[in-house]
């Protein structure tokens, strides 16, 4: 349930509004689309943004770094409280649009604005938002950078320094270095398993491992069942390609698998 508010003077920028899925799993009868935000806050499924009532300032934007539910899942429940646009990458924006369309409790009329990696958006005379391209286990992920008169605030929440990705380009290391030289006021950083020493191998290595396993069943006549995160389009792409290599027809099952894959295909990511 990621959500971070940054205040500069009397202007506030909110980064992410996430949904904590494991808390919902505890409450099996929870129908998120029909639940009130206060009830979701009570079970710690979404951020408790009531703390912002004590913070003086105007929210200028709600910025999302990527389309995972733990970063956008609370938007249908909380965004309507703020007279501010929702800014995200094109793929994340479309996922947010779908989230909002399924909401049954609140009406969300915030303007949705798609900002691509490498672009900037002026929020006010003192605040400029920049999206820097990075990699993650979901396509079209960026590191938002908020440029202020006091220096840059880098919101690096979920990223992977993958130099050989399966989809898209490597992270924009040149721009990251340049921002560092220009001066960073604050780095807000988080990444899954960051407490473990070492590094995460490239997705290209994962692709080779998946191919090795799937192609080993080339002469088998039985059905092959493969599970993966539905939002991991690079992995889904690899699985589908490997299926074709051994003369099999890939069949996607599940609403989430359909949502993420169809959206990626329609937007020409695959």
List where the protein language model places each region:
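His/Asp/Glu-rich metal-coordinating catalytic cores
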Residues: 1-61, 68-270
């Amino acid at each position: 349930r990621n959500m971070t508010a940054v205040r500069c003077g009397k202007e506030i920028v909110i980064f992410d509004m996430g949904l904590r899925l494991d808390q919902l799993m505890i409450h099996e009868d929870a129908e998120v689309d029909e639940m009130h935000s206060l009830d979701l806050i009570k079970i710690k499924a979404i951020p408790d943004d009531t703390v912002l009532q004590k913070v003086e300032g105007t929210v200028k934007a709600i910025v999302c770094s990527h389309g995972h539910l733990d970063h956008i899942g609370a938007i249908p429940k909380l965004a309507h409280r703020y007279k501010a646009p929702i800014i995200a990458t094109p793929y994340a924006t479309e996922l947010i649009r779908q989230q909002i369309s399924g909401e049954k409790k609140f009406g969300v009329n915030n303007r949705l604005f798609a900002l691509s990696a490498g672009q900037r958006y002026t929020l006010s005379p003192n605040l400029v938002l920049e999206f820097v391209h990075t990699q993650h286990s979901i396509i079209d992920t960026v590191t938002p950078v908020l440029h202020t008169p006091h220096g840059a605030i880098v919101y690096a929440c979920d990223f992977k320094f993958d130099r050989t990705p399966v989809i898209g380009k490597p992270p924009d290391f040149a721009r990251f270095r340049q921002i560092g030289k220009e001066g960073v006021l604050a780095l807000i950083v988080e990444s899954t398993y960051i407490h473990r020493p070492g590094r995460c191998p490239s997705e290209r290595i994962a692709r080779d491992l998946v191919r090795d396993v799937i192609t080993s069943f080339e002469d088998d006549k039985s059905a092959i069942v493969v599970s993966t995160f539905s939002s991991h389009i690079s992995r889904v792409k690899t699985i589908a390609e490997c299926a074709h290599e051994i003369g099999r027809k890939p069949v996607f099952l599940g609403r989430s698998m359909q949502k993420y894959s169809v959206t990626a295909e329609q937007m020409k990511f695959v």
